[in-house]
Every structure is written in C-alpha cells, then in structure tokens.
C-alpha cells in the first residue's frame, strides 16, 4: 500500500480536516490546525507531503521521525500541528486496514469510559451560571471557565476582586454539586498569578490552567509551592521535549497536550507515559473538531493517568458548525452522564461525511482570535 494524495479542507467554525488517500482505496482522516493560523498549517501539510507520497502508510513511526527530523529546523506550533494531523490520518488508515480501533493497536483499554468536561464561555456570572445549568441538565458536572479578563503585569486590587467575586458567585450558585477548572489563558503575569491563585483558593477550583504563558514555564514550580491548587498546562507545548522540561522542573499536576498541536497520537502517547512516570495526570486539550476529539480519546483509553477530556460540544467558538455536524456516526460519540465510551469503528472511529466537508469547505472563514488592549493602549494577552 502506498500514499497517493493529501487533501486539506478548511471548514467552519475554525477547523481543518485532512484526507490521506492510498492506492488501495483506504483513506485516513486527521485534523491539523492552529486556531487562527489554519492557512499556515495547511501550507506546512502540503510541504510535508513530499516525505509521504509513495510511502507505506503503515510505517507510522518512520514517517513521523522523517517529518520531524528530515528538516534542519523543527518543532513549534505550525510544523508540529501539521505532523499531528498527518499522524492521526496514518493511524486511521492502519486501524481500518487491520479492522480494529486505534486503541487496540496501542495495547488496549485501561478504562471503560472517559469523563469529559465542557468549556463554558460568558463574561458575566449570570451568563456562565445559565450555561452551566443547561449543561448540568444534560449530565455534565465538570466544567472549565475563564479565570479572569486581561490583566496588567502589576494590576489593581479592583481587578483581583472582580475576578474573585465572579468565581465566588458561581461557586455559591452550585455549591459542591459541580467541579470547575479556571483557565487563566496565559493572561496573567507571574506576580499577579501568585496573588490571584491565593485569593481563589477558598472556592476550590479543580485546577488553575495556564496561570502564566508556556514561555514562562519555569514559574510553574514557584507558583505551585505557594498553593494547594493543582496547576494545569500544556496546550501551547508542542513536543515531548517541551514537556520534558516542565516535568523535570515540577509544579504542574495536570498535563494538557493538544492532539492536533503536539505531534498527534504517536507523540502524545509518549507524553502521557512521561507524565505517568512523574505522577502527573493527563487531560488533553481539545476545543476543536471531531477528529481531534477521537484522537484524544484513543490516547485517553490507553493512558492510565488520563483523568479528564475536554470536548467542544456547544462551545461558543462553534459558529457555523457543531462538534458532530460532519460526522455520520453521531451516536458513537453520545455522552452518558458526562462520560463517553470508546470509539467503536476501526481506525479513529469517525465516519466523516465527505460530501458535506467538500461543500462546507467552500465557505470556510478565516477565524482570528480577538486583539485585546490594556487601558494604556498596549496589547494584552488574549
């Protein structure tokens, strides 16, 4: 069997799908994308196709290493996201050829179902509470919320009080009937993160995500030393080499690699195993589409330390398409009390509606995250 073609489809709301075709008619699907940089990743995928056309798709490890090592310059969000989507598609092909789900090729299940959580947007507490109640009625009891708005390097007590009051109101509305993590989104400097985390401790969030940017990862250990709250990070780390430094430094309790950014299944299985050796939990980042979610699930179901799986059903970013709109076998991704079962079909287990993908790709938006500014006019972290 030989790889014959790679085709990319940019799609609403902000996704990109990849189809890898073979000379024997077996196709694999992947989801290589950086939110807001889909065209750039698309170009990288097609550059990497030079290493793939005419090659045996079953040699996933060799193809991964070739894509990673054959170029003198490597790593980073664009190249690793391109590799990630290609890697997902290769695993999809291999599972389909052998007639088994990918998790069977990775050693089999370590659990029967995986707990998921839902991201809830909204700037006002009333909006967040309403969103959480709607999801709670559908069986969710684990959520992730924005921890704060933009903050200056040294900000005011008023800014801290506003962030804390918002969380206090949400906790008061639900008591201990729900769990929620707080995502700082890298918006907070190290000095302010230390203050804000301490003030939030009484409300017992499940974790604090990206309290500072990944570029400031050396700060995680210092922050962790001043709080009992678990620190989560990893969505903006792109290889096991990035995660190696974080694990060695300590401070992070939950790793959050993104299966569409951090090299795909091949790389993230290694990252999960590294985390287990340090007694660190795994909770893959996934505000993306169905192929990315399926890839996450295959890693979750073979990783003993996987504890939570993000999923994007109903997320506010999904303007123009919902999580399962491009999927025929929607029932296979049904949530039961906030849990999801292992994928059933061979490969990644996602039956893509290719005709719909082709049609909707004609109207793909160029999504960009907003640009925020501080009161003094300087650019703020989003």
From Swiss-Prot:
Belongs to the mandelate racemase/muconate lactonizing enzyme family. GalD subfamily. The record marks 310 as: Transition state stabilizer. The lineage of its organism: Bacteria, Pseudomonadati, Pseudomonadota, Betaproteobacteria, Burkholderiales. Reaction proceeds via an anti dehydration. It catalyses: D-galactonate = 2-dehydro-3-deoxy-D-galactonate + H2O. It comes from Ralstonia pickettii (strain 12J). Keywords: Lyase, Magnesium, Metal-binding. It comes from the Bacteria. This is D-galactonate dehydratase. Binds 1 Mg(2+) ion per subunit. GO terms for biological process: amino acid catabolic process; D-galactonate catabolic process. Mg(2+) binds at residues 183, 209, 235. The record marks 258 as: Increases basicity of active site His. Its EC number is 4.2.1.6. It is an enzyme of class 4 (lyase). SUPFAM superfamilies: Enolase C-terminal domain-like, Enolase N-terminal domain-like.
